[in-house]
């Protein structure tokens, strides 16, 4: 979180913060269609890990006396705050570099490295940013394979073997997506629909 705040300060100071802020917060309600609402709902479900079994995983580790509504509100609030901070970091840097804001992997892996390369100490901030992205991806993937691990354990398979096996399958899918955009597109479509 501290690194996000440092990157936010850098973005405010060195990015085109006014354009980035306007891009994020000036709504064009003429573009609010049924499809746009469905895309927004899909994004919300994805970022909150709803429908993927992770709710079950995190719920199983909650103390019995925890307030579920309070936990839900805290997660939704913190997720929204982190997303807003990330947007306030990313888009001012994109606009300061004269790049077009995109979305998804194109923004993350194509546009942002160009933005970071044009910055003073961009290699340091870019490395820090992508380390944060890697940590977020790893922590999400751990919770995503837990339902499969629990199911395999019920069939009598050793937890360590189940974890390593599912982790290897996920890793192979990730490696395959590096070498073929068709694999990535198929995985993206399967997980988003």
Regions found by a protein language model. Give the residues of each.
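Loop-to-transmembrane helix boundary motifs in multi-pass membrane proteins
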Residues: 78-84, 123-126, 135-138, 151-181
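A generic transmembrane alpha-helix motif of multi-pass inner-membrane proteins
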Residues: 180, 185-193
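Membrane-embedded alpha-helices of multi-pass transport/permease systems
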Residues: 52, 138-149
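Membrane-embedded translocation segments of transport machinery
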Residues: 2-138
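Juxtamembrane/interfacial segments flanking transmembrane helices
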Residues: 16-18, 144-147, 182-183
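Active-site proximal loops enriched in glycine and acidic residues that flank catalytic Cys/His/Asp
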Residues: 60, 132, 146-149, 166, ...
């Amino acid at each position: 979180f501290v690194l996000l705040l440092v990157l936010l300060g850098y973005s405010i100071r060195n990015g085109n913060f006014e354009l980035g802020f306007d891009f994020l917060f000036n709504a064009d309600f003429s573009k609010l269609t049924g499809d746009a609402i469905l895309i927004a709902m899909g994004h919300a479900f994805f970022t909150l890990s709803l429908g993927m079994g992770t709710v079950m995983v995190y719920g199983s580790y909650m103390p019995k006396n925890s307030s579920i509504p309070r936990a839900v509100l805290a997660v939704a609030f913190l997720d929204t705050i982190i997303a807003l901070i990330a947007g306030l970091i990313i888009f001012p840097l994109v606009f300061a570099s004269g790049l077009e804001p995109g979305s998804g992997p194109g923004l993350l892996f194509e546009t942002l490295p160009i933005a970071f390369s044009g910055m003073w100490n961009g290699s340091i901030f870019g490395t820090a940013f992508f380390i944060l992205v890697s940590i977020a991806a790893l922590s999400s993937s751990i919770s995503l394979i837990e339902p499969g691990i629990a199911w395999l354990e019920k069939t009598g398979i050793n937890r360590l073997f189940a974890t390593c096996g599912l982790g290897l399958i996920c890793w192979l899918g990730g490696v395959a997506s590096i070498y073929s955009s068709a694999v990535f597109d198929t995985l993206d479509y399967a997980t988003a629909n």
